Amino acid sequence: MSAEKKKELQVAALENGTAIDHIPPSQLFKVASLLGLEKMNNTITIGNNFHSNKMGCKGMIKIADKFFEEDEINRIAMIAPNIILNIIRDYEVVEKKTVTLPDELIGLVKCNNPKCITNNEPMLSRFHVIDKEKGTIKCHYCERKINKEDIIIK
């Protein structure tokens, strides 16, 4: 990155870590809470309402020396699908991927059916994603459909 380009940055560049970009502003603090950022000792930068040609405005989180596991990424996808995850090493983006819901969620979501076996026995919940755009999921065991707004993340 050129010296002139660095002067234009609104948020400091990361040497190593993860930048979560294109977070809808209304979801930024939900994402931060879901990731447990308040418990991390890493350097964290959170910015909201940055100008975005793609979205109008966006949120961003940068976490130094943190690289997320698959289940952490899947948690983010449940509340803010289509965000961009940038993996940074030595100030360079080495991997960039759009976060999408996987086809199946295991142990990440609580079924909101009180009679579901997953709420009455010591077992992991299992959901099939039936509509990635709307964020609709269906319990594997009781077949209850849950809309994105009603998802309870464990």
UniProtKB/Swiss-Prot annotation:
Q: What cofactor is needed? A: Zn(2+)
Q: Which gene encodes it?
A: pyrI
Instruction: Give the UniProt keywords, A-Z.
Output: Metal-binding, Pyrimidine biosynthesis, Zinc
What organism, scientifically named, is this protein from? Parabacteroides distasonis (strain ATCC 8503 / DSM 20701 / CIP 104284 / JCM 5825 / NCTC 11152)
Q: How does it assemble?
A: Contains catalytic and regulatory chains.
Residues annotated as signal peptide: none
Gene Ontology molecular function, alphabetical? metal ion binding
Summary of the function given for this chain in its UniProt record = Involved in allosteric regulation of aspartate carbamoyltransferase.
Q: What is this protein called?
A: Aspartate carbamoyltransferase regulatory chain
**HAMAP family, alphabetically?**
Asp_carb_tr_reg (MF_00002)
Q: What InterPro entries would the database entry show?
A: Asp_carbamoyltransf_reg_N (IPR020545), Asp_carbamoylTrfase_reg (IPR002801), Asp_carbamoyltrfase_reg_C (IPR020542), Asp_carbatrfase_reg_C_sf (IPR036792), Asp_carbatrfase_reg_N_sf (IPR036793)
